[in-house]
């Protein structure tokens, strides 16, 4: 079946509830330009939170450095009184389920065992990172790790993909009129 399965543009509960009733997932957006978490925080309670996930949509690099990324939304949701487990599930499990990443988003048999250990739910500082169950980062230091192997067919698809005739400076000449914006009396 074709259709729109999610929305990241909701800015109020009425809009979000209408989309939930139509079967959509709600991506609760809180980035640099749009801040919708506070208005939509009640979605992170039963019976709705299983159909919600966090997204940033846009995030200025300085905001990433100062505030964080999805971890910032988790901390902010907890600040608004959301159960920390629900906040983490909204950041990890729900998006993995939505995007059909069936071996990610949880710590369980058959999953990849990609996870982070944090100090506490207030500060959310990462103390350790595990990838496929192997410690890859601790105490702020990245451990040696084997570079992932990229399948040959993916390498082939990424190379020799842009084919264009030889270009000259004349090819970039633009003869369209300039300064076309003006005032119309009236």
What kind of feature is each model-predicted range?
Residues 1:
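Glycine/alanine-rich phosphate-binding loops at beta-alpha junctions
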Residues 4-104, 116-124:
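Active-site-adjacent C-terminal substructures of enzyme catalytic domains
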Residues 65-81, 85-186:
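Active-site microenvironment of metallo-dependent hydrolases
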């Amino acid at each position: 079946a074709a259709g729109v399965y999610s929305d990241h543009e909701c800015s109020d509960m009425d809009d979000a509830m209408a989309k939930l009733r139509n079967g959509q997932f709600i991506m609760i957006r809180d980035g640099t330009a749009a801040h919708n978490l506070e208005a939509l925080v009640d979605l992170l309670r039963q019976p709705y939170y299983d159909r919600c996930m966090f997204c940033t949509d846009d995030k200025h690099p300085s905001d990433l450095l100062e505030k964080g990324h999805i971890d910032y939304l988790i901390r902010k949701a907890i600040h608004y009184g959301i159960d920390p487990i629900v906040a983490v599930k909204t950041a990890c499990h729900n998006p993995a389920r939505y995007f059909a990443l069936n071996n990610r988003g949880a710590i369980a048999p058959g999953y990849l065992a990609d996870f982070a250990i944090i100090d506490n739910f207030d500060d959310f500082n990462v103390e350790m990172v595990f990838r496929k169950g192997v410690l890859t980062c601790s105490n702020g230091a990245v451990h040696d790790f084997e570079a992932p192997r990229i399948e040959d067919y993916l390498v082939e698809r990424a190379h020799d993909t842009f084919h264009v005739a030889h270009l000259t400076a004349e090819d970039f000449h633009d003869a369209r009129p300039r300064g076309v914006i003006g005032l119309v009396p009236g």
